[in-house]
């Protein structure tokens, strides 16, 4: 049974970690202790309160945090988990962050011998709840293949796109297209109502 640490129990992360709790040994971490306590009551799993003191080896560490600063804090800061990981652990990040931070995290992962997959998600809260997210993965093919079954716990469509900055750019491009489309549709509706 794979040992998984899931970091970030927000709107997306909470149900994603819930899917993983079926058939895996899941431990969760969240800055807000209340959310983590609620997750433990709802699903089968364990809780940790300090990432910098990890001493139990995990097969996978999965993060879904809010922004660049959050990702840096949980990985490479003095409070982060990277310094305690070994080369067998695959770190999968689902956060929507900048290419700059992904490049920095990947550089540190290589230096420390950590397998890192940059894997943004799309599909919204409903996709997370229903286990039907689309996942665009950047990183090493063998790490992706090793992680495929874990990703399928909450992802309906999982594809590797190659380099780290490629997938981040794809996610940002897709988000921008959606915004432009929505704005255009809204403007068209208002023009129609005016006429």
Q: What name fits each language-model region?
A:
Residues 166-195:
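Helical "substrate-binding/catalytic lid" subdomain
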Residues 1-63, 89, 125:
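NAD(P)+-binding Rossmann beta1-loop-alpha1 motif at the extreme N-terminus of oxidoreductases
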Residues 97-176:
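Rossmann-fold dinucleotide-binding core
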Residues 51-115:
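Rossmann-fold NAD(P) dinucleotide-binding segment
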Residues 15, 60, 66, 70-73, ...:
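Amphipathic alpha-helical hairpins
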């Amino acid at each position: 049974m794979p040992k998984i640490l899931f970091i970030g129990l927000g709107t997306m992360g909470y149900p994603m970690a819930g899917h993983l709790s079926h058939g895996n040994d899941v431990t969760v971490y969240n800055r807000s202790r209340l959310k983590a306590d609620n997750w433990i009551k709802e699903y089968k799993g364990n809780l940790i309160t300090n990432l910098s003191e990890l001493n139990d080896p995990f097969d996978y560490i999965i993060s879904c945090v809010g922004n660049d600063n959050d990702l840096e804090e949980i990985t490479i800061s003095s409070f982060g988990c990277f310094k305690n990981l070994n080369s067998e652990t695959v770190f999968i990040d689902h956060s929507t962050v900048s290419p700059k931070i992904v490049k920095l995290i990947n550089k540190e992962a290589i230096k420390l011998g950590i397998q890192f997959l940059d894997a943004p998600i799309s599909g919204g809260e409903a996709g997370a709840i229903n286990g039907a997210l689309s996942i665009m993965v950047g990183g090493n093919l063998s790490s992706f293949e090793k992680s495929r079954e874990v990703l399928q716990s909450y992802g309906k469509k999982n594809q590797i796109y190659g380099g780290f900055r490629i997938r981040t750019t794809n996610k940002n491009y897709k988000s921008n297209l959606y915004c432009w489309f929505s704005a255009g549709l809204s403007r068209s509706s208002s023009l129609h109502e005016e006429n």
